[in-house]
Amino acid sequence: MNEDELKRLFLYAKKHREEHACGGYPYEHAEILRLFITSTSAKKILELGTGTGYTAAYMASISSDIHIDTIDQDEDHGKIAQSNWEKLGIDQQVRQYLGKAESVLPGLRDIYDLIFFDGYSPSMKFLTHFERLLKKNGILITANMFLKDELGGKYMRALQRSNRYQMGVIEDTTIAIKLFD
């Protein structure tokens, strides 16, 4: 997969969102993901917010050794994403879960090197699952932190108060490194 294919998929995702007035925003700071995936040699990734599949495709393009589990509740987006991954030849790297994250997360048992939340502002109920699913020294990347709340709400404050994470903010994205279990 080359950069032109990823660019086309990104533009398609933007156009789809505009035409359908849906919440499937493509993540605009993918270079942040590349930085943390390559610097930590992340191989097992959990994504919340599949949309049309752009971000999973971007992450899969970094290395054929990367495997992504992705969750989205929109069945139409799931079909579009699956089709996009098949066209790009990365469908074997991505496992898709259709359903609300609140329903899917409790059933997940894998431990992830990196978790990428790209839905609306995250709820506190996700943090417990993230702590369980993220390995020690794993990276939790949360986009759209300020979508509903300029301060990032309770989730951001909980990360700041927690002694389990070292964190920082880049644009609207929070990066948190899990220091211990």
What are these regions (language model features)?
Residues M1-L114, S121-I141, M145-D181:
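A short alpha-helical cap/connector motif
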